[in-house]
Regions:
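Nuclease catalytic cores that cleave nucleic-acid phosphodiester bonds
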Residues: 2-154
Length: 154
């Protein structure tokens, strides 16, 4: 198992690295050239700036059984289609059973924003310590689940 992080503006990199290190799991952080990341643990891969360039690079690298951390539903859907697992920075696990609904809701919201004369919507609320805690608990559970599944294959 390998962990890939869609690292552009990802607030949970430290949590991912800490948990991955405790389980001796390799991590790759992917970001575009507009960002600068350093890590003592993870491999950092820079991808040329461009719409979805990081997303497509991440998907080209991940394989069945890998774990992808992303807030992008499209990336999650592509990862799931390759047999990888995916988790949102909120801690929500993406699954084949919920991804279609999530993509449809995203599409409907995008259409509503385009149709609205008020395009000055608020952004997301500030991330809290509780958000980090929720992600940490959920991520740890998912990692342990995947490690147990992989142990059964040996």
């Amino acid at each position: 198992m390998h962990i890939y992080v869609d690292a552009d503006a990802c607030p949970v990199i430290g949590i991912v690295e800490r948990i991955a290190k405790s389980h001796n799991i390799a991590v790759t952080l992917l970001c575009d050239t507009n960002h600068y990341l350093t890590s003592d643990y993870s491999e950092v891969v820079y991808v040329g700036a461009g719409a979805d360039a990081v997303d497509f690079k991440l998907i080209s690298l991940c394989e069945k059984g890998d774990l992808v951390v992303t807030q992008d539903y499209g990336v999650a859907a592509m990862a799931l289609s390759k047999g990888a697992y995916a988790i949102h920075q909120s801690g929500k696990w993406y699954a084949n059973e919920n991804i279609d609904l999530m993509l449809m809701e995203r599409h409907i919201s995008k259409k509503a924003r385009r149709a609205s004369s008020k395009n000055h919507m608020k952004g997301p609320r500030k991330r809290s310590d509780k958000d980090d805690y929720n992600f940490e608990v959920s991520f740890e559970r998912l990692v342990e689940k995947l490690l147990q599944e992989n142990a059964g294959k040996d």
